[in-house]
C-alpha cells in the first residue's frame, strides 16, 4: 500500500460519498423497500461524526452494487489527499483551448514526454534561446565598438 490509511478521515469520506449518492436518488442500501431504505439512510446521516458507526453501517446495510465503487472513490481521494501535501506531487489545472491542447499532446507524443515535461522543455528552450539572443546582441555591440 503506497498511501497510509487514516480510518477517521476515510470514514468521513465514505459518509460523504454515500450521502451524496443517496441525495442523487441512488439506493445505497441492500433493501428493496423504500421506507426501509429511507430509515437506514437516515441512520447513516445521523452517524456523521462517529466513524465506527459509519463502518458498522457499511458492513451491515451497504448495497451489493456499491463496495467496489466506494473503494475506488476512497482510493482516489486518498491519493489526491496525500499528493496534495507535497508541492512536487500536487496537481494543478490550467485552461487550454482544445486546439492548443491537441498540438501540445501531439508534440508530447512525438517527444515521448508527458505534457508537464513537454511544457517544461519548451520553457527551457525559450529561455536558452533568449539567453543566446542576448549574448549575440552583446557580441554585436562589442564588435561595433571594437571596429570604431
From Swiss-Prot:
Q: Name one Pfam family in it.
A: MatP
Q: Which Gene3D superfamilies match?
A: MatP, N-terminal domain, Met repressor-like
Any single GO molecular-function term of the entry would be: sequence-specific DNA binding
Gene Ontology biological process terms in this record: cell division; regulation of DNA-templated transcription
Localization, per the record, is: Cytoplasm
Q: What is its main location?
A: cytoplasm
Q: Which GO terms describe its cellular component?
A: cytoplasm
Q: Say yes or no: keyword Metal-binding present.
A: no
> What HAMAP family does the record tag this protein with?
MatP
According to the record's subunit comment, the protein's assembly and interactions are: Homodimer.
Indicate the family of this protein: Belongs to the MatP family.
Q: What NCBIfam families does this protein map onto? A: PRK05097.1
Give the protein's biological function: Required for spatial organization of the terminus region of the chromosome (Ter macrodomain) during the cell cycle. Prevents early segregation of duplicated Ter macrodomains during cell division. Binds specifically to matS, which is a 13 bp signature motif repeated within the Ter macrodomain.
By what name is this protein known?
Macrodomain Ter protein
Which organism is this entry from?
Answer: Haemophilus influenzae (strain 86-028NP)
Name of the gene: matP
